[in-house]
């Protein structure tokens, strides 16, 4: 159990940054769930909106990816 | 469908039995092999699989060194060429299996470009199709055990994303001139809000290549790292390692899905950016 305070901070920071990935999961679930809710009300319109669904998921995911990037930077680049 | 499956079960019951026995033996051999090497806990580091190595000789790695990344990128290019050249060799009215695969991929991406970016984006379809097939095959080849996943490296995906970003930006200015800047001037918003929105739009525009590249690399890399973490569990648990092996099988199925979806998402975002370049007005 050796190591210095800076390394400890690095690991704690990386773990905290990983919380952002969970937040992105909430966002992605929101997009997909709302798509499903809308699709079940009007199934005939659903097929044309799958591209929009994936774009929405990608945008929601992008911010989670920034959190992941911060975690990676803290682990390997600092 | 139901009668079909019962029929095949009746016919090939013995063959199915043999398959189950083989799978069981394979799993036991897999766990036994791990027992020897990885008895000391997580001896394999999950990130080791992304290490770039020289293929020939020793020494430092430069720009023109042939590495495992180069090899697997070349292999995915070869696969794309093989699919398209082999698939379109006959060009028959009733397509063969390879031809229908090639037609399926072509039609899928063409439809996507037309739906998302509009008809006038079709001249840029070859570029988008190339991107899609390269990423798809790089992802799928990375799922072959002991292979190397090129798209898990940000260096690879960043080049792809920067190419898209530069293409789209230059195209926007060539097609619209200074009118391309109206992309950042949201004319549907109240006048007082527009300068603030312009700053936000500008930031989000320049963040595009970052999120575009890291989304692909991050998804692929995280999935492969999870597989290796579970492999480490299987080695550490001994005979109970059968549970992580089942988990690996399930996650592998998920990774096949992710490989296809991430190629799709990369392509469809390229189409969205292209649409912004061709029609910047809000």
UniProtKB/Swiss-Prot annotation, chain A:
SUPFAM superfamilies: F1F0 ATP synthase subunit C. The chain crosses the membrane at residues 11-31, 53-73. F-type ATPases have 2 components, F(1) - the catalytic core - and F(0) - the membrane proton channel. F(1) has five subunits: alpha(3), beta(3), gamma(1), delta(1), epsilon(1). F(0) has four main subunits: a(1), b(1), b'(1) and c(10-14). The alpha and beta chains form an alternating ring which encloses part of the gamma chain. F(1) is attached to F(0) by a central stalk formed by the gamma and epsilon chains, while a peripheral stalk is formed by the delta, b and b' chains. Keywords: ATP synthesis, Cell inner membrane, Cell membrane, CF(0), Hydrogen ion transport, Ion transport, Lipid-binding, Membrane, Transmembrane, Transmembrane helix, Transport. GO terms for molecular function: lipid binding; proton-transporting ATP synthase activity, rotational mechanism. This is ATP synthase subunit c. The gene is atpE. The lineage of its organism: Bacteria, Pseudomonadati, Pseudomonadota, Alphaproteobacteria, Rhodobacterales. It comes from Jannaschia sp. (strain CCS1). The record marks 61 as: Reversibly protonated during proton transport. Its main location: membrane. F(1)F(0) ATP synthase produces ATP from ADP in the presence of a proton or sodium gradient. F-type ATPases consist of two structural domains, F(1) containing the extramembraneous catalytic core and F(0) containing the membrane proton channel, linked together by a central stalk and a peripheral stalk. During catalysis, ATP synthesis in the catalytic domain of F(1) is coupled via a rotary mechanism of the central stalk subunits to proton translocation. Key component of the F(0) channel; it plays a direct role in translocation across the membrane. A homomeric c-ring of between 10-14 subunits forms the central stalk rotor element with the F(1) delta and epsilon subunits. The keyword Transport applies. GO terms for cellular component: plasma membrane; proton-transporting ATP synthase complex; proton-transporting two-sector ATPase complex, proton-transporting domain. It comes from the Bacteria.
């Amino acid at each position: 159990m050796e190591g210095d305070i800076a390394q400890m901070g690095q690991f704690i920071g990386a773990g905290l940054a990983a919380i952002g990935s969970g937040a992105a999961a909430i966002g992605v679930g929101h997009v997909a769930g709302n798509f499903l809710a809308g699709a079940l009300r009007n199934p005939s319109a659903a097929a044309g909106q799958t591209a929009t669904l994936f774009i929405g998921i990608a945008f929601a995911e992008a911010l989670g990816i920034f959190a992941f990037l911060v975690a990676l930077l803290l682990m390997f680049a600092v | 469908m139901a009668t079909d499956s019962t029929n095949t079960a009746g016919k090939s019951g013995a063959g199915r039995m043999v398959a189950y026995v083989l799978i069981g033996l394979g799993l036991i051999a897999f766990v036994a092999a791990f027992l020897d090497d990885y008895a000391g806990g997580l001896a394999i580091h999950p990130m080791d699989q992304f290490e770039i190595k020289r293929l020939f000789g020793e020494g430092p790695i430069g720009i023109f060194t042939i590495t495992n990344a180069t090899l697997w990128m070349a292999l995915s290019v070869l696969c794309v060429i093989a699919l398209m050249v082999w698939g379109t060799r006959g060009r028959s009215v009733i397509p063969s299996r390879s031809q229908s695969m090639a037609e399926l991929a072509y039609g899928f991406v063409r439809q996507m470009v037309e739906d998302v970016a509009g008809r006038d984006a079709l001249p840029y379809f070859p570029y988008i199709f190339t991107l899609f097939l390269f990423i798809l095959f790089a992802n799928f080849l990375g799922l072959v055990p002991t292979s190397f996943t090129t798209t898990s490296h940000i260096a690879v995906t960043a080049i792809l994303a920067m190419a898209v970003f530069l293409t789209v930006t230059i195209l926007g200015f060539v097609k619209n001139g200074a009118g391309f800047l109206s992309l950042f001037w949201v004319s549907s918003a109240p006048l007082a809000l527009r300068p603030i929105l312009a700053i936000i739009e500008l930031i989000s525009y320049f963040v595009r290549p970052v999120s575009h590249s890291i989304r692909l690399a991050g998804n692929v890399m995280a999935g492969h790292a999870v597989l290796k973490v579970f492999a480490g569990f299987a080695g550490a648990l001994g005979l109970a390692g059968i549970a992580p092996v089942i988990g690996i099988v399930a996650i592998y199925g998920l990774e096949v899905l992710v490989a296809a979806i991430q190629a799709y998402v990369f392509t469809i975002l390229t189409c969205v950016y292209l649409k912004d370049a061709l029609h910047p007005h809000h």
